[in-house]
Design a protein with these regions (language model features):
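Short acidic, glycine/serine/threonine-rich loops at helix termini
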Residues: 39-41, 83-85, 140, 176-180
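Translation machinery proteins
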Residues: 1-34, 57-58
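Long, charge-patterned amphipathic alpha-helical coiled-coil/hairpin "stalk" segments used as oligomerization
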Residues: 48-154
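Ribosome large-subunit tunnel/peptidyl-transferase-proximal elements
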Residues: 3-5, 31-43, 47-50
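Flexible, glycine/charged-enriched surface loops at secondary-structure junctions
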Residues: 154-166
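Residue-level signature of catalytic and energy-coupling elements of molecular machines
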Residues: 38, 90, 167
Length: 181
């Protein structure tokens, strides 16, 4: 697969059937009534008035980007977020998802809590979290198969494109998974 061609790159959000096994941190750029809904949903709310200040303070913007896994934003604030925080959030793949005025942010947040992001960028390797050590082997297997099936669906030759597959814990050794083509 030629990943220099952007159409061959993969960026997928996979819904994990057994969840991520750890809490997900989600923030929302919102004001007024929508910020009250976001707080009620358990989201951290970032006031739209501070977006410009964060854009001027690169270090604070990076800390914020690293603190949260996903971002949501009211549609009117998307342009401001892109202008001031796009250089920080964009390369991390954390640009906010727009939330229409008639949609409850809790619905979107609940969907993101069980989501893993699979990105290839311009390298031929994928790195993604599929769960935590506290989950059982059956749960981790279900999550791994969900990710595997989604990635295989995107590759033109399926398993023929896979040279090797490894599974590892954060600080543990890696184990090779046999890929049968």
């Amino acid at each position: 697969v030629d990943l220099k061609n952007p159409s061959n790159r993969i960026q997928e959000e996979v819904r994990l059937p057994s969840g991520r096994g750890k809490p997900v941190r989600i923030a929302m750029f919102a004001g007024g009534e929508m910020s009250a809904k976001a707080r009620a949903a358990g989201l951290d709310v970032i006031d739209p008035m501070t977006i410009e200040d964060l854009g001027g303070n690169r270090q604070q913007a990076r800390k914020m980007a690293n603190r949260y896994d996903f971002f949501l934003s009211e549609i009117p604030h998307m342009g401001t977020v892109g202008r001031f925080l796009g250089v920080v959030l964009g390369p991390r793949g954390k640009m906010p998802r727009p939330v229409p005025p008639n949609v409850d942010p809790a619905m979107i947040a609940n969907g993101l809590k069980d989501t893993a992001v699979v990105r290839s960028r311009d390298k031929i390797t994928f790195h993604t979290a599929l769960g935590s050590r506290e989950q059982g082997l059956d749960d981790l297997t279900l999550n791994a198969m969900a990710i595997w099936n989604r990635v295989m669906g995107r590759l033109e030759r399926g398993t023929g494109n896979i040279r090797s597959c490894y599974v590892k814990t954060s600080m543990g050794p890696s184990y090779k998974v046999e890929v049968i083509t």
